[in-house]
Regions:
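Phosphate/NTP-binding elements of NTP-utilizing enzymes
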Residues: 1-278
Length: 278
């Protein structure tokens, strides 16, 4: 009997033990897989060093808004959906994900996000199953709306205020905000109004020095990524090689037009085979 009581105590203790959470970067590497049709680095998601801090900020209770003011093809979208996958798996709450158009959203969801869910075990386990087939219920997991077991993710295009009007959400994603009308962004922000705990994740490549992502960046604490200089060892600001100290382009690269796909993504194999300096 004493052994039985001891075993019962241990099992009860497990039920009330605090959950051990892995940091987002480690979680992403263990659970997120990129297919070769969406990344030139297929396999387990290896987060670039400059993307680690934004991912970790998603679980910082003192941070409500994460702004990625990054250059094009710098892993903005990959970083973002790895972070969203983490939040939906570990801290599930209703989410609204807005893109410049409904077509953008539908193509992204169908071509990248849904396959990503299929390869991410924790997120796939949140998908309801059909009683008839035993497979993922395709009536609840659709291109524009995924009704997970613990929360709902809705995609929307920014073409009209009606598209972004939905029930209140805790997570709001604004993808490529420089392509989204400011009035639409304000309407979207109404979806988190009154929430004590919320996250706004917004990304874009800056186009102008006024408005858009650059203005949002200036509103924040303006973090930059520094790396050790390969020559002197001092930490220097990370910048793309094709720009000089004044920010001017030193050279540009051209590649075959068909390397850019209809959904706006790129076929890196075609880029590698056709790229040339100008």
């Amino acid at each position: 009997l004493p052994k039985m009581v001891s075993l019962l105590d241990r099992e009860i203790g497990k039920l009330f033990a605090p959950r051990l959470l892995k940091p987002p970067v480690e979680w992403a590497f263990n659970n997120c897989v990129l297919r070769d049709n969406v990344s030139e680095l297929p396999g387990s998601l290896k987060v670039f060093p400059y993307a680690e801090a934004p991912l970790n900020d998603l679980v910082d209770p003192n941070i409500n808004k994460v702004t990625l003011c990054w250059g094009s093809q710098s892993s903005k979208t990959t970083t973002m959906y790895a972070g969203i996958a983490y939040l939906l798996s570990e801290f599930p709450k209703d989410t609204l994900w807005i893109m410049p158009s409904a077509e953008n959203a539908r193509n992204f969801s169908k071509g990248r996000w849904l396959p990503f869910i299929d390869d991410c075990a924790p997120l796939k386990s949140q998908c309801p199953l059909s009683a008839a087939s035993g497979r993922v219920d395709t009536d609840k997991i659709t291109n524009m709306r995924q009704e997970f077991l613990s929360c709902t993710l809705t995609f929307a295009g920014a073409g009209s205020e009606n598209n972004v009007k939905s029930a209140p959400v805790a997570y709001l994603v604004l993808d490529e905000i420089d392509e989204i009308d400011p009035d639409i962004r304000l309407a979207a922000l109404e979806r988190i109004k009154g929430r004590r705990e919320y996250k706004i994740i917004q990304t874009s490549t800056p186009k102008e020095e006024t408005g858009g992502i650059w203005e949002e960046y200036l509103y924040g604490d303006q973090r930059k990524y520094f790396m050790p200089c390969p020559h002197c060892g001092d930490h220097i600001e990370f910048a793309w090689r094709q720009k000089d100290k004044s920010g001017n382009l030193r050279y540009s690269i051209a590649f075959d037009e068909d390397a850019k796909l209809e959904d706006g993504s790129y076929d890196f194999h075609k880029i590698h085979s056709s790229a040339r300096y100008l």
